[in-house]
A protein has these predicted regions:
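Phosphate-binding glycine-rich loop
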Residues: 29-77, 83, 91-95, 101-103, ...
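PLP-dependent aminotransferase class I/II
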Residues: 8, 35-42, 47-53, 114, ...
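Conserved G/P- and acidic residue-centered "switch" motifs that form tight phosphate/ATP-binding loops
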Residues: 59, 96, 156, 186, ...
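Structural detector of well-ordered beta-strand residues that form the stable sheet scaffold
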Residues: 54, 79, 100, 152-154, ...
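N-terminal "arm"/small-domain region of PLP-dependent enzymes with the aminotransferase-like
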Residues: 1-30, 35, 302, 344
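PLP-dependent aminotransferase-like
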Residues: 68-157, 164
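Short beta-strand-to-turn element immediately C-terminal to the catalytic PLP-Schiff-base lysine
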Residues: 179-180, 194-199, 239
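Conserved active-site segment immediately N-terminal to the catalytic lysine
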Residues: 155-190, 205, 217-222
Length: 367
């Protein structure tokens, strides 16, 4: 079976270095908050182009802690999209704030900036933009809105490690950037891991404190925090993989280029790419004009496991339905989930698997 993602490939490619890094941690005296985490935080800041990075347990925690650091609380509102991983919205709800869903662009599937300003009011405290599938949002427009209203921007970069907008790395443009190192991601560890980036010293120190019970340097909890840390083992692995992230992303781009030039079926549309974005293709998501479910079944019968990201938007999920405002217009969000399909995309994907995927998609018919 050929899967749309294969985490093991990221290990096999650099197994010798990764095994050595794991062994070094196991024989060290520090498994939590040691030199590997500090090194990775520094390396990642240098890579992204921010002053500070804070390793945390996962991307959901990164967003939650960032919201808390900004001061988001019950009664506040946070604008974001419904077409995202549930964790984006779970982090908002976790603070007691209300997520306000806005629609996405039908072209790029990123946040529709025209809808953002319509939903801003006195309760709006943060806007979370999601760089979905590895593609940047329209950050110029978002930052203009941010400046106009004085609203902080959190970049959800969970799927966009290494991506750029007008030459700048995502995660360095907003107030805070939040990253995931889940095993399927472009930059991945072998468990859960996340990180927040910022240029604001106060936010850096606040996120760091909140991620460790709200402690100050004397272990006196000044705020009610939580326990969310990137451990030494994951950091050691990430230090190895970060060296190769640009190379791995380039491999994804090459696969995407081959798909775009070789898949030629009137029923299938390729993902649009913004001219201002260096797209790193965490996922390659096609749109099927007719027979989407039939296509998925057809691929599976022929040894290819395709996915849907995401089959159920967050506002349709039971726990979050109550947050949908009567005035919310999520037409594009609800439209695209009926047609999108994620086809195989990961560094290490073999040519024979790529070619098989292309051939099967070109042969697909609803007849």
């Amino acid at each position: 079976m050929i899967y749309f993602s294969y985490p093991k490939a990221g290990y096999l490619k650099y197994s010798e270095e990764i095994n050595k890094s794991i062994e070094d941690v196991l024989y060290s005296e520090t498994y939590i908050k040691g030199e590997n985490v500090l090194k990775f935080e520094n390396n990642f800041s240098n890579y992204i182009g921010t002053k500070y990075s804070i390793g945390v347990g996962n991307a959901t925690d990164a967003i939650y802690l960032s919201l808390r650091a900004i001061g988001v609380k019950k009664g506040d509102e946070v604008i974001t999209v419904s077409h995202t991983a549930t964790g984006t919205v779970a982090a908002i709800a976790g603070t007691g704030a209300t997520p306000v869903f806005v629609d996405i662009s039908d072209k790029y599937y990123t946040i529709n900036v025209n809808e953002v300003e319509k939903n801003i009011n006195k309760k709006t405290k943060v806007i979370i933009v999601v760089h979905i599938y590895g593609q940047a949002c329209d950050m110029d427009s978002i930052l203009t809105i941010s400046k106009k209203y004085g609203i902080p921007i959190i970049e959800d970069c969970a799927q966009a490690a290494g991506a750029k907008y007008k030459g700048k790395r995502l995660g360095s443009l907003g107030t805070i950037g939040c990253f995931s190192f889940f095993p399927t991601k472009n930059l991945s560890c072998i468990g859960d891991g996340g990180l927040a980036t910022t240029n604001d010293k106060y936010l850096y120190e606040k996120i760091k404190s909140l991620g460790q019970y709200g402690w100050d340097k004397n272990r006196d909890a000044k705020s009610i925090g939580t326990n969310s840390r990137l451990d030494e083992l994951q950091a050691a692995i990430l230090n190895v993989k970060l060296k190769y992230l640009d190379q791995d992303n380039q491999e994804r781009i090459q696969i995407a280029t081959l798909y775009r030039s070789s898949i030629d079926n009137m029923l299938i549309s390729h993902p649009e790419k913004s001219k201002h974005c260096y797209h790193v293709y965490h996922l390659y998501v096609i749109s099927v004009k007719k027979g989407r479910d039939k296509l998925i079944e057809y691929l599976r019968k022929n040894g290819i496991y395709a996915g849907i990201h995401y089959s159920l938007p967050v506002h349709k999920q039971k726990a979050y339905k109550k947050y949908l405002l009567k005035s919310s217009n999520l037409t594009n969000t609800e439209k695209i989930i009926k047609s999108i399909v994620s086809i195989p995309m990961y560094q290490g994907l073999e040519n024979k698997s790529i070619n098989k995927t292309i051939d099967l998609l070109n042969l697909f018919s609803t007849n």
